[in-house]
Amino acid sequence: MQRDGITVRLLQDLEDIRTSWSLMQQLRTNHSDEESYLQQVERQRRNTGYNLVGALGSDGQLLGLAGFVYSEMLSRGRYLYVDDLVIAEGHRSQGIGGVLISWLRTHARNFGCSSLHLDCSNHRLDSHRFYRREGLEDRSLHFVLDL
């Protein structure tokens, strides 16, 4: 998909995933090195069907990234869950996030999903505003018990 000079495509080979490391670090700081990140992505791809989709500028630079899975629950039916969504610092508020959400929405419909879900940390107020502008609604709280 291409829109507003942004090309959106699945990142599937090892080099694509390796290229995503520095951008994903802006969101997920728990991996201290590229190798542990690559291993985690591969494990998630194998175990949960995790996918990465990238938004690339006209020069091929990775400007945005989303990680997602398909899932199904009695309460929701089949849905697409966005686990990671990050836009490169310096490129935020330029429509790239909207292009990714649009791609994810279309992709979810094409795969028979009835909804798109994501969690967002309480302190990410700018992200909350963005998601609301994109049509997502606050519908639940997410509770956690660290073990």
Q: Each PLM stretch: what is its role?
A:
Residues V53, G64-A66, L80, L85, ...:
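Conserved GNAT-family N-acetyltransferase fold
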